Amino acid sequence: MLSYANIILKKALCIPTKQKSLDEIPKTMYTVFVEEVCFMETIKNVLVGQSGGPTAVINASLAGVYETARAMGAEHVYGMRYGIQGLLQEQIVDLNECLSDKMDIELLKRTPASYLGSCRFRLPNPDVDEEPYKQLFHLFEKYEIGAVFYIGGNDSMDTIARLAAYGAKVKSSIRFIGVPKTIDNDLMFTDHTPGYGSAAKYIAATIKGIICDSSVYNLNSVTVVEIMGRHTGWLAGAASLAAGADCNGPDMILLPERAFDEKAFLAKVSQLEKERHTLVIAVSEGVKNKDGEFLCDLVSGPGAVDAFGHKAALSGTARYLADLIKAHLGCKTRAVELSVLQRCASPLASRTDVTEAYQVGGAAVEAAFRGETGKMCTIYRVSDIPYRTETGLTDVSRVANKEKCVPDEWISEDGMHVTPEFARYARPLIQAELHPFYVDGVPRHLHL
């Protein structure tokens, strides 16, 4: 444990790692720190999994968990293949054998999607079906697991909450910590969520390119761009970040937080068409009409739902709006669906996002070694200029199965755009780049 204290203390004091030992530092400089670290628990092995929809930076959180756990003395860092569902089938890998050197870690940070695989599996109520819990805790005992980390969104936090509650019920000493992840940015009690910044950066850059492309012909046209976001408009709102000195940004942004008003929408499009010959509209896939119907369902009909009651896929909102505009206003229209590109475009990942994803992974491990359980790591924004954040913790039960919407005051009065406050919030999250390692002209990734 002192070896870990040595590393962290040297970083805090700006002392080169190879230059001095802890013994050479004046005791008054580190007594309190060492006392705090020495109270940390000894954990032999840890287990980490990934769940839900992937992001461009979810593997950076995995890297943070792995490196921090090893630095703090964990002998083995095991990974769940395909989340909790794969774990129930004892699909487990030893990450010590998979991540053999620093280059593997750097490749992992730059690899999109979920390195370990994912699932959308919901644990049952243990009062109704206790068998999966008995099976899981048997595996924890078999592999001598002292802490479990689950990287995911709202539904994944439900898994951590259930495991922590069951662990308390059976008086287990295992620690359960949630690591936040979602491009939707809808987790409660955190300023923002790792994964969102990179998706927002991709959306802003793509919208900017579409605006350029749509303006090449001297004729009236409307391009409708469909962006992910089932119940919240954080991703669609990120289209506003395309605006700058060389671009006005999208002409309209429609969010799920406001019900779609067909008459007002067509009137606004007609008005804008008189001012400029090309329009670009960003729309969340989950926009509903005043009757609570998804616009996409008006095209394709209701689809299947997953284990958590969410529609498995939403698609067709942009097509619906493009057809509506063409039918009523007669101009040329095009529907563009960004789809999974929003969450896997690692060459456009935000370095800020990658860094914070790694940090929350490490903070989760530190929390477990301090004896915390049933918590999720959070990000607290200290300041905008300069942009600075700190990590914290919240009870995972406060986050599980809940959603954070775009504040009403960040949505324009007519409900068809966002205010400058939204951009001030989101712009720091898309800053800087982490350049991929290119081989034969394409990015190199790491795979199991």
What spans do the regions from the language model cover?
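Short, positively charged and aromatic/hydrophobic N-terminal segments
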Residues: L2-K10, I15-T17, S21-V32, E36
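N-terminal phosphate-binding or glycine-rich loops at protein starts, especially the Walker A/P-loop
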Residues: E41-I92
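Short glycine-rich or small-residue beta-strand-to-loop segments that form or flank ligand, phosphate
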Residues: N45-T55, S114-R120, G146-G152, G178, ...
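Short, ordered loop/turn segments at secondary-structure junctions
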Residues: S51-G53, M80-G86, R120-F121, G153-N154, ...
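Short glycine/serine/threonine-rich phosphate/pyrophosphate-binding segments
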Residues: P54-V65, L87-L88, P132-K134, N154-R162, ...
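Accessory alpha-helical/coil subdomains and C-terminal extensions
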Residues: V77, L139, A147-G152, D158-S173, ...
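Glycine-rich oxoanion-binding loops at beta->alpha junctions
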Residues: E90-G146, D155, P194, K208
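C-terminal non-catalytic interaction/assembly regions of soluble proteins
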Residues: D297-L448
